[in-house]
UniProtKB/Swiss-Prot annotation:
Signal peptide: none annotated. It comes from Bifidobacterium longum (strain NCC 2705). Residues 44-61, 1003-1016 have a biased composition (Low complexity). It is found in: Cell membrane. It is a multi-pass membrane protein. Keywords: Cell membrane, Membrane, Transmembrane, Transmembrane helix. The chain crosses the membrane at residues 77-97, 126-146, 179-199, 235-255, 282-302, 326-346, 372-392. GO terms for cellular component: extracellular region; plasma membrane. Pfam families: UPF0182. This is UPF0182 protein BL1029. HAMAP family: UPF0182. InterPro entries: UPF0182.
Amino acid sequence: MSFNDPFSILFGNGGDSRRNNANNDDPIILDVEADGDGPARNTNAGPSGSSRPPRGPANPRITRKPASGGSGGSRGSKILIGVVLALAIIVGLFFGLSRFITDLMWYGQLGFQSVVWTQLGVKIGLWVAYALLMALTGFVSAWLAIRARPDSADGSTIRINGDVVEVGKSVSSKTARRVAVVISLIVGVIFGSQFNANWSEILLMFNAQSFGTTDPQFGLDNGFYVFVLPGLKLVLAAVAMLLGVGLVFSVVTHVLMGGIRITMPVNGRGLFSITKRCRRQLGIWLMLNMFAWAVRQMIGVFDQLTVQGSRITGASYTAVHANIPVTFIMAALTAILGVVLGIWLMRSHTLEGQASIGVRASAALKAWRVPVTSIAVVVVVGLVLTVAWPVLLQRFRVNPNAQEMESTYIQRNIDATRAAYGLDKLKTEQYKVTDKGEQGALAKEGDTTAQIRLLDPQVVSPTFKQLQQSKQYYTFADTLAVDKYEIDGVSQDTVIAARELDLAGNDNRNWVNDHTVYTHGYGVVAAYGNKVTADGQPEFFESGIPTQGKLTESEKYEPRIYFSPNTTEYSIVGAPEGTQAWEFDYPTGSEGALTTFKGDGGPSVGNLFSRILYAIRFGSDQILFSDRVTSESQILYDRSPKERVAKVAPYLTLDGRVYPAVVDGRVKWIVDGYTTSDAYPYSQMTDLGSATKDSTTVSSATVSSLGSQKANYIRNSVKATVDAYDGSVDLYVWDQSDPVIKAWEKIFPGQYHQLSDISGDLMSHMRYPESLFKVQRELLSKYHVTSANQYYSGEDFWQTPVDPTESQSQQDQDILQPPYYLTLQTGGTKEPVFSLSSTYIPAGQSTREILTGFLSVDSDAGNEKGKIGSNYGTIRLQELPKDSNVPGPGQAQNNFNANADVSKELNLLQSGDTQVVRGNLLTLPLGGGLVYVQPVYVKSSGATSFPLLKKTLVAFGDQVGFADTLDEALDQVFGGDSGAAAGDAENVSGDQSGSDTNGGQSGTTDGKSDSGSSSDRSPELQQALNDAAQAMKDSQSAMKNGDWTAYGKAQQELEDALNKAIELDK
């Protein structure tokens, strides 16, 4: 056997000497082959008839004559082993494919199986296509190198006595081709798997849409940057990788085949040679790689329009006048360098034959002078143009005149940002405010005043749980939702929650109970947002089990909730007709009501094959053997609404909040979906996770931010609904002007419903999404200015205030105040509108926190089928005058805390075992200024305690009101009579227990608390009023002492006395 046979281990018998040792006396036959490719035959006769040796070295190939006789093992054993291996492979494949098959069943049941096949087809197609191209490129490169193999090459060298000696067996062309095929396929599969991960960019590139607007630098449609450019860069990167692999394969194969020969010097001599055919091939590969690099450099200039600068996103003066032209110059130099190096390599004859590397140093330097000089020139020029020139231009030309030089590009950034984030139609007005509360100031804003929300959805979840949870296996979200419903012909702000299943609360956990008995939650609970009961509890208009109230009067109402955010376990439901029901429906009597699922909510597990698949998926043999799994059974899983929408529309960014709504007699979960891009030219890049993080997302388990994603274009293009009973998903195109959703509609035809399919009832619950508003709020803190000079100076930049109701540690971390849903009347609206609102204070670290702006967006989509309300999505910004001193939220909270009377009463409230909980601090443009409203809750420290609304704080300017009701507190800051009645006005008692913190106004106002003089009352009526007054005093005393039993008794006595007084006063 020869020395240095690199492929003998893979394709020969000489790789392991132990295989050729004892116990095998077969004769060894030496088979001599010419040039390593075939048997040596003396067929080359010269003109005189004498034979001449074959071309190339005659190398011995060692082969072994097969031994005669039978094999050592039995044929039956081999067959058995083969069968076992085949079965193992089949079982392994079945287990591996079980998840894919069950996913197909899940998507098929929902009607979205095309999502799987489209993704899978594109991914596999890209993988296979790129793998084949990579393998073909590598093989062609190696095959060409093998064909260029020199006749005299024999493959290996060793050193003997200090001299280079040629010995050994050359690698045969056949063996080299085999190796090239194997390695090419391996490389192709590896790189193909990386390429298919970017399936969405490729699909969008081939389904590109026009934005109808062009970038200001190159004049190209913005659709080119959003759709075409990401895919084009991906394709160019793939081509560059192909050419790079081709070059590597060529070099390696030429080295193995002898086209490139190099050894280190020994005794002053060495061997270095590149054959002519090798040089030509390498020269071509080198030029192709340099051309690909040049093209990628040219395409890279478009990235300048989305590069993140120190001040703006997009090309600045230096980028436009230095970076962009230099990039074109460098691309040209790269291409020229590729031509120079390729031609030099193909024509450099000094690289042929043997050369004494150690002795002929000067000749070697001369041979390499052209490439070394060319590369050095390009590197030096590149450093000057790409580094020195932009730095010098920026420092000596731009910086001294920055405002003038950059104004054009800042203006581009302002215009593009406002367009990309939907801020170009912002309505701004100057809001001239007053900080003096005058009597009757709210008389013209009675509807808004009546709708001021008192229930804080972040605080009252424990109250909902305590009063409406019913059983421990139910729960409510820790942050409730705010919606609006028409009750008795009046639109009411509502705090609503679904009663979800919570298996963690069930003490009797086992497979049967977890997966076949406790399968669903039951009903929704809804309370008025603007009022509470006399004892501070939410005033429910939908509650109880079975559910009763204003929302469920329809006979078609379906209260069962099989799909909800808190439902994480799978359930097996359904049974043949006539089978005794075993699903627990709701508690009633001693046993509870039972039911059987009748919908189409999940894949069928009615046959053995599907049972086996799901038993593997969920690792449960109970699915195979339980009698609860029948021919009509369905398996419900992936039951979170957000998860279901994410699976059927993986290209959407989903809002961090999912909320329930009663729509046409069914409970629907509504999910907002966004289309985003990070390639909109000149638009400011935003970290969506940071922009949507606030005190709610930090403290809540059910509301989240958008995550760590950067984008500079966003649209709320999709509204999705998930039916709480059967889990069906419906996707509606909400923003029909968005080019991105148009592209996805082309990619997944038939997946979306159009706007005309939205019913009037569903339309009434479509609201403006929080996450989008928070992103826009973040951008408008700077981009409310429309002048480049004003933006450059930054003197009018704002910021969102931190949440002053949070702990000091949270405030130190700059946890922002969340926006709030409210029905209010702002500038430009004649009637109160359901809105989402927030505030601004000056940017920076100043301790003087004054209000600079009030931001709101119309969130009422109307109630007309297939038509969005005309004002929906209108963003309104009310800017306060520069000399205004209206306190910001933090300063208003400080005013509350610093008020002596407020502090005294709060201290009394939290004495003993009670605790005071501050609710959300609402800001409302009322009475010609800004009114702050904060509900104050009280709860005991017991394990079953829950907050009750006991007081309300109100601030207007520097005036503070603090009373049992919002109505009374408003009167305190508006001269004794605000002129309007709040939603809790009916809770105002004859005995004013609130404090007049302004020292000059009575908390009780004429006409609102007196029903007549005492002399006009009957003795019975007077006694009833006296009983009510005493009951109120008893209530206050019990509350201060933390005696909630006595408090409840006193409240009942108060209610009885008031009812009696009402009857007597008729």
